[in-house]
């Protein structure tokens, strides 16, 4: 491969950025609601469910995401002799990211829910348990946990680079390949700028949401 211009590098890296953005969006879209379900399991009065969920969260938070991605990708073959094609790489990335981040969001939800005072207003309004949760508790919980969620979301932007583990052509993988072929650091510099702008946009968006939800400001 001949020497590339900066514009050519940016064009190739933009394609990788699209994949990184896809990983980011899919992860949030599924891990946020899944995390709430897992939080309910973590707070369940059923000891078996509570124990299973605690073990799951402990494993997800106590082992590297990179390792989890490899288990999700290679697991079907090593455990069940199910052959998977290269198209499964991106799906394995989605699955690995979702189950990992859902565990973190579950603990954030749990701490937010358990910090809420229980039920006097709900009793006055005559709400049942489900109505109390969705109409009174959850909106307040979201306000309380948003800073913690923001931290995880910003971390997710950077973690998308771990998809290179499964040879997914996201931005970091492309930057690494270009840096090797072009024998210079410019692809990494461009990738760093992309990541910084992505994180800046996310931070501004989350700050805007936080202000919108702050009814008392």
Located regions from the model:
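Transmembrane alpha-helices and adjacent helix-loop boundaries
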Residues: 1-217
């Amino acid at each position: 491969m001949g020497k590339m211009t900066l514009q050519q590098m940016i064009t190739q890296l933009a394609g990788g950025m699209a994949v990184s953005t896809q990983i980011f969006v899919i992860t949030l879209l599924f891990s946020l609601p899944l995390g709430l379900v897992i939080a309910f399991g973590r707070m369940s009065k059923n000891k078996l469910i509570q124990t299973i969920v605690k073990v799951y969260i402990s494993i997800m938070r106590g082992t590297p995401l990179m390792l989890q991605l490899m288990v999700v990708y290679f697991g079907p073959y090593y455990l069940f002799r199910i052959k998977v094609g290269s198209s499964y790489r991106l799906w394995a990335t989605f699955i690995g990211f979702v189950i990992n981040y859902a565990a973190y969001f579950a603990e954030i939800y749990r701490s937010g829910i358990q910090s809420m005072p229980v039920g006097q207003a709900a009793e006055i309004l005559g709400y049942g348990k489900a109505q109390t949760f969705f109409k009174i508790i959850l909106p307040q919980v979201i306000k309380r946990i948003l800073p913690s969620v923001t931290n995880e979301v910003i971390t997710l932007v950077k973690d998308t680079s771990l998809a290179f583990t499964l040879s997914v052509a996201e931005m970091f993988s492309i930057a690494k390949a270009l840096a090797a072929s072009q024998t210079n650091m410019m692809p990494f510099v461009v990738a760093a700028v992309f990541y910084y702008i992505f994180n800046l946009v996310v931070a501004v968006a989350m700050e805007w949401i936080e202000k919108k939800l702050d009814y008392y400001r």
